[in-house]
Amino acid sequence: MAVPKKRKSKSRANSQNHVWKREIVKQARRAVSLAKALLGGNTNFLLVSPGPTTPIKPNPKKQTGRRPRSQRRRT
């Protein structure tokens, strides 16, 4: 017969959630710091290319969405 698992205590769940949230905050701070450095030009460890000189044209042959009924595979 199936036996339900033990419930995790509220304090343990809160503790684990706090660890997750702390890591998220740390990553967010790093991202904001990097963005500030890039916008301010205060970084020399990252090479930023100026972007393409000619605009990139979309591929006209690329199909989007579903195929027409006549071109669908029959299974």
From Swiss-Prot:
It is found in: Plastid, Chloroplast. The keyword Chloroplast applies. One of its GO terms (molecular function) is structural constituent of ribosome. Its main location: plastid. The lineage of its organism: Eukaryota, Viridiplantae, Chlorophyta, Nephroselmidophyceae, Nephroselmidales. One of its GO terms (biological process) is translation. This is Large ribosomal subunit protein bL32c. InterPro entries: Ribosomal_bL32.
